[in-house]
């Protein structure tokens, strides 16, 4: 019996832990902060301070019923270089036009201009007639491939840089960002930062 009592006593003592309470977990766990949207990482070329002035290349006559695209004075500009034969360009255009609205809602007034590199004016006109979603978009067309290449070489090292190509300018008309390649939904914060 004594043996049983001793075993029970040891079992009871072993089950008793130090009654000191463990520190409570922190009320708020530290989270890893997401990196801030970085225009300099998003842009292939970004400019701070002295920057080239954004201009348009010589433009072909506008499509029927459209005014000539021009750079608005005193407004931020997003110039998108595209073509009707460029599938990545066509996929990103609805997103770009949506972002124009979103940017305005976020207090970033920007004018989006679509500069077509289609050499055949009737092809562009047919495309615009079939795609009513671009009815309100400001669209211009480069007058010639040679004019375009001379003009774009002011902003990119290789005039053969593939499209889509995006040139973002501040309200003073100076280039802030050059970005090659398609837009993705997750690019919005960096694009917004590039326009600020």
Spans of features found by a protein language model:
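N-terminal targeting signals for export/organelle localization
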Residues: 2-59, 177, 196
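A short beta-strand-turn-helix
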Residues: 46-77, 101-102
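Short pre-active-site segment immediately N-terminal to redox-active cysteine/selenocysteine motifs
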Residues: 75-77, 82-85, 162
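Conserved redox-active cysteine motifs that mediate thiol-disulfide chemistry
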Residues: 81-98
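Solvent-exposed loop/turn segments at secondary-structure junctions
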Residues: 83-88, 117-122, 144-146, 174, ...
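Thiol-based oxidoreductase modules, predominantly thioredoxin-like and allied folds used
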Residues: 108-123, 135-146
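Short, internal strand/loop/helix patches
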Residues: 128-163
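Thiol-/selenol-based redox modules, centered on thioredoxin-like
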Residues: 161-196
């Amino acid at each position: 019996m004594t043996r049983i009592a001793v075993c029970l006593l040891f079992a009871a003592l072993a089950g008793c832990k130090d009654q000191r309470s463990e520190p409570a977990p922190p009320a708020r766990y530290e989270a890893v902060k997401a990196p801030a949207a970085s225009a300099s990482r998003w842009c292939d070329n970004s400019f701070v301070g002295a920057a080239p002035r954004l201009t348009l290349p010589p433009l072909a006559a506008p499509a029927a019923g459209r005014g000539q695209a021009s750079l608005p004075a005193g407004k931020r500009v997003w110039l998108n270089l595209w073509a009707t034969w460029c599938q990545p360009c066509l996929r990103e255009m609805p997103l770009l036009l949506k972002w124009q609205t979103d940017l305005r809602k976020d207090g970033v007034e920007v004018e989006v201009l679509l500069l077509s590199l289609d050499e055949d004016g009737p092809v562009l006109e047919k495309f615009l007639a079939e795609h009513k979603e671009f009815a309100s978009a400001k669209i211009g067309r480069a007058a010639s491939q040679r004019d375009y290449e001379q003009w774009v070489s002011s902003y990119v090292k290789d005039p053969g840089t593939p499209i889509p190509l995006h040139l973002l300018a501040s309200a003073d008309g100076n280039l802030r960002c050059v970005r090659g390649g398609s837009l993705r939904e997750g690019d919005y914060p960096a694009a917004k930062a590039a326009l600020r």
